[in-house]
Amino acid sequence: MANYSTNEFKGGLKIMMDGEPSSIIENEMVKPGKGQAFNRVRIRKLISGKVLEKTFKSGESVEGADVMDTDLAYLYTDGEFWHFMNNETFEQIAADEKALGDAGKWLVENDVCTITLWNGNPIVVTPPNFVELEITETDPGLKGDTAGTGGKPATLSTGAVVRVPLFVQIGEVIKVDTRNGEYVSRVK
């Protein structure tokens, strides 16, 4: 696999760290008044999920991770595995709960997810950035009840719980940002 120099570091770049594929979360170039410049990098290990901070000297190189990101459609779950299918080749891949992480609460059948494969095995499942889900349970919003924060918890069809505005009712479909789990808008 290719080697990456510190000047090629950016968020989302996949590298090998301690024999495990990792993803760069944040990269900060530091040029002190005295001494050599360096990069302060936050890295998430893709298999263990650990986040660590590491410094690299300017010009140092790191081995790139031999991982492959593929877009696959979510099919179903059998309780132990979540099954995905490649829409071109119709090849199916099963991901376990460890690879899925928090993505499970955002998955809707036939949604296209990005799956990171390492040695042919799924290690990370990334749901679409925005999903449209139906509200199955929430408190009724009372007119004029805006003294608080202006929000209320709502349970969605997948079981996820998000804060929504008071005017949103049971049965409505809302758009949710899966990266931070926040309400975006109602779907007309």
UniProtKB/Swiss-Prot annotation:
The entry's keywords: Cytoplasm, Elongation factor, Hydroxylation, Protein biosynthesis
SMART domains per the UniProt record, alphabetical: EFP (SM01185), Elong-fact-P_C (SM00841)
Sequence positions bearing N6-(3,6-diaminohexanoyl)-5-hydroxylysine: K34
Protein biosynthesis as UniProt keyword: yes
Subcellular location: Cytoplasm
One Pfam family hit: Elong-fact-P_C
GO MF annotation, one: translation elongation factor activity
Highest taxon above the source species: Bacteria
Post-translational modification: May be beta-lysylated on the epsilon-amino group of Lys-34 by the combined action of EpmA and EpmB, and then hydroxylated on the C5 position of the same residue by EpmC (if this protein is present). Lysylation is critical for the stimulatory effect of EF-P on peptide-bond formation. The lysylation moiety may extend toward the peptidyltransferase center and stabilize the terminal 3-CCA end of the tRNA. Hydroxylation of the C5 position on Lys-34 may allow additional potential stabilizing hydrogen-bond interactions with the P-tRNA.
Pathway(s) where this gene product acts: Protein biosynthesis; polypeptide chain elongation
Any single GO BP term: peptide biosynthetic process
Entry's Gene Ontology cellular component terms: cytoplasm
Primary role: Involved in peptide bond synthesis. Alleviates ribosome stalling that occurs when 3 or more consecutive Pro residues or the sequence PPG is present in a protein, possibly by augmenting the peptidyl transferase activity of the ribosome. Modification of Lys-34 is required for alleviation.
NCBIfam families for this protein: efp, PRK00529.1
Annotated family: Belongs to the elongation factor P family.
Protein name: Elongation factor P
Species of origin: Pseudoalteromonas translucida (strain TAC 125)
Gene giving rise to this polypeptide: efp
